[in-house]
């Protein structure tokens, strides 16, 4: 798992580099980020949305991007709301309270997605989000350890 001290510190690039290294070394490798927040998304061949960073990480692995590589995506939409994308499909706009009320369901989706990748690939390079030291978010954190 790749973690950092905050947002914008290079986790996505480092994850892509590890993906490429292990792919070139002959491993069947895939990227994974449980939850991502970004204004822009990548649209798969199936018309599903996922994080752009996970899309280029998939390409570094020699793979077509799949939404299980980034099962939950939040797109800030203003007024403390975010559009929630689950497995590539929009679920509507939610504030933090409404989003966290679905924590158990989201955790199941994240776990199922990771399990599917682990069954298909020899290595799964996991990217964390923000900082794992944000104690106030620990109870709801789906992305870090």
Segments the model singles out, each with a brief description of its role:
Residues 1-145:
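Flexible phosphate-sensing "switch/lid" loops adjacent to ATP/NTP-binding sites
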